[in-house]
Amino acid sequence: MGATVDPITATGTHPRNVDGQAITIAVFSSVKWSGRIWLPLLFWAVTLLARVEAWLRRPPGTLARLSFIHFARWTLVRRIPYNGAPQQKEKLSYPRLFFESNFNGGWEEYIDAFSHILTKGMILFWGTSYGFPQPKPTAPFKQYIKENELEASHFYSAYPQATTTMVLAAHDLERKFDAFKGRIEGATPDAFAEAWRAFLSEVQADL
Amino acid sequence: MAAADVAPVDRADIQGNILRAYGKAYDRTSYVFTHLEDPAGGREWLGGLLSQVTSDQERPDPKLRPDETLNVAVTYSGLQALGVPADVLKGFSDEFRAGMAARAEILGDTGESAPENWEDGLGTGQAHILVTINALTSQLLERALDALKAGVEAAAGVTIVYHQPAQLLDEVREHFGYADGFAQPAIVGVSEHKLGGGIPEEGKWRGLALGEFILGYEDEDSLPPGRRLPSAPAEPLGRSGTYMVFRKLAQDVALFRKTLREAAALYENGDEEKLAAKVVGRWRNGTPLVSSPDAPIPGFDREDMSNNAFRYLDTDIDGARCPLGAHIRRANPRDALGWEGLDDSGLLAYRHRIIRRGMPYGPSLPEDAVEDDGEDRGLVFVCFNASISRQFEGVQTQWINDGNAFHLGHDKDYLLGDSSTTNKMTIQGKPPDPPFFLAPQAAFVKTRGGEYLFVPGLRALSAIAAGRWQ
Amino acid sequence: MSNRAGQATAFMAITPIVAGKEDELRAYLDGLSQDESPFALLPRTHFARWVILDDWNDEKSQPKKDHLLSRYLIFTSNFDGDLSSYLDELCDKLAPQAGELWGRCVGCPDGAAGEALKEYLMHNKINTGFFVAAYPHLRVGDVKRALDTRARLIDFAVSSQGMRPAELQSAFNAEFLLTDGSR
């Protein structure tokens, strides 16, 4: 009698949620009355903040700097669209907060990062959801996420072998490489070699 | 959490060599795996061993230390072979129940390191009980082994399926020539004096909660108000126990030396020793690169705790001293995964610590030899942790077999690689010096076999031997 | 309400699965492989997925239990540029798949393609509240090109180590200037 265990990949989540290095997570949580008012306000505020930061060219906020997240979104589902019979009209007793994200690394590490680094952020977004335990201790919080997580049926990444840090490094590297190519036009071999060494030193964090 | 809040450690109930190492005087070890044909016979044999099992109890006089120590661990198939019922078995962790061979993909044990290529007896479910004997001399080890074998002969349905002897090398180094076995975790109530072994906080180090290593105690996640204990098998089996990882890792010393030699030709005028230090993050005598980037400290004392109290972010954020992908920086990042402006910079690393108690095996390759002599040599890697998946597997999958956490893409640990190949390794240069690259190449280390085991506390062992499960 | 982050867009549609067709739909999704994902036909797509929502999960602390009357197919996508032209592409390129998936949903137009399908998806759209992207200005093509350049640069940096200047320069030119269309 072998132990029957769910197929767990190195990422700690079901294989269907994984494409190469990319991991996806989707969570629905039921939202209290207070959330109906709070969440739209929150979304408006953080969206505005993000736009202001972009306009001011200030470094992006903590969430965007968590270097293993490609994309993340929160959505409040208040009603399910109706398409006529034979669909039955849904009446939601509670709106549902939908969270979706694509990231790298392990599922556990991802949730840990939210617990430790985005602690206040967690409470802002999930504080009005039923059953939301505190971000720490992490064990009940991970349990909560697991219970409310939806497994993907088909998940696609356009660049599955790349992690977010690789994408950011590649982008930074490309810019600097273009500048380098401009600098070495018509250079002698010795000047080229020196410039190459200087370039490698400049981009070593991207390699 | 302060030491005063913590439950006192029941040292007599915890097996030895976990919280406190037996020490380098015990320089000979044998790892003996047995197979149990019959539950009753197996339990009886286990019962016969109980009085010899060495605990973590304080010895009143260190000079009265025993000639040898004996410890017992059990695989999942071993628990089944002992007759542990299904509802009790469910309390053990998923990865332990699956076994190390089933986790091969995750661990990077593919190609030549894949379980189908492992040595007979390991990874097939045949290995049930691991008896580890440490002794002060080889004669004492022989004597203890003979006694064990006699007991196995006399017992009903017990056979030895695997035996690996091991012994410390000179200066407690491992086969690639690096000082090993030190810089272990600092644990509250046990070893807080190990500066640098705990969690880096603002200006100080905090010991890790005991429950990160021993079941039945609060771990780092046991926060107020609930202060819940981490999940563990139910009493009496769970308390004072821990999970153990056993991996026989064969090392190709000749290949490693040859690779370093060839690569060093282009590195800083052939400084092979420095290149060797860059791969690991410590000079061969144990001096950390972060503390002393240009030369090892002569007579470096690895037992001096203050030598281990270094961090990365304050002086070496870019890896100019200790490369970002160096072995020790990967295996224990300390504050290196820290977050800008965050006080508790060790928070993304602190729940992945392990206690290492492995031993080298096989004869040393003569110094300066760069051709393999065909001898089997390497490291019996042994570690202890409360959660194999979070701790050992977490380190192996996220930090050793991948580089993303360190912004190194898919670069793996250059020393361990994986079964087929290492990737490149970038050795960061101090501006204006450019980085130096170690080219991808065949792996120096191969997995020859392994098991996940449970190390019961002493009362738990008695209960198992008596068939008393609840 | 924010469906955009930089030039990237988030889209979500929830469509009710025709009663009795859930197993077929699920089987079809199970049969899709990531290596030959239909989404590869939409090169503006960074990440996308289909998820089946069987029912809500209820928390113990909820006063009432909530149950869905149908099963739903959820489609989410993170892609480049504006929604309207993306849906045009989807309704054109993904016609066969659309039939197998949305074709099994209530209210889907016959043929599951073109303008009618686009209207159907827009009708079932759920607007995103807050959308964050790590690289909001990079399109899929930008990402892939940069990743490729990085891989080639790394290979070159490793293999050219120790070359004398003249050899280094000519090797560099051969790798990056003659074969690389864009200087």
Model-derived features: where do they sit?
Chain A
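Short S/T/G/P-rich N-terminal loop/turn motif that feeds into the first structured element of a domain
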Residues: M1-R73, R78-P81, E90-R96, N102-E109, ...
